[in-house]
């Protein structure tokens, strides 16, 4: 059976160039948001982290994952970022040396919620009992 791998792809799902550009875009967006350059009241009231950016293989689309500090008001922040998308794309174009400024889309980073859900599950009495009985049998 033939394997279909993207040329130069890595275990994390993108080429070295995709990963490098994604990290550059991530730094640019984090700088823009931390400086308050967008001048939007919904953004100015929040500290926003940018844990990940994923680039499409042609580098024309950047999916930017964001997380407001504390995980509150995610929908408000996403709406504000959508309103300021044109400005943010222009700022990214000035800061990142690419032939074309990538189109951008924003998504909430839900990995923290998932990790918290797993932590709560691991702390339940039933799971603790199973974990303790497994360690006693060893």
From Swiss-Prot:
Protein name from the UniProt record: Ribosome-binding factor A
Subcellular location, principal: cytoplasm
Family indicated by similarity: Belongs to the RbfA family.
Compartments in which it is found: Cytoplasm
Quaternary structure note: Monomer. Binds 30S ribosomal subunits, but not 50S ribosomal subunits or 70S ribosomes.
GO BP terms: maturation of SSU-rRNA
Function: One of several proteins that assist in the late maturation steps of the functional core of the 30S ribosomal subunit. Associates with free 30S ribosomal subunits (but not with 30S subunits that are part of 70S ribosomes or polysomes). Required for efficient processing of 16S rRNA. May interact with the 5'-terminal helix region of 16S rRNA.
Organism lineage string: Bacteria, Pseudomonadati, Pseudomonadota, Alphaproteobacteria, Hyphomicrobiales
TM ranges: none
Entry GO CC: cytosol
HAMAP family documented for this protein: RbfA (MF_00003)
Assigned keywords, A-Z: Cytoplasm, Ribosome biogenesis
Molecular-function annotations in GO: ribosomal small subunit binding
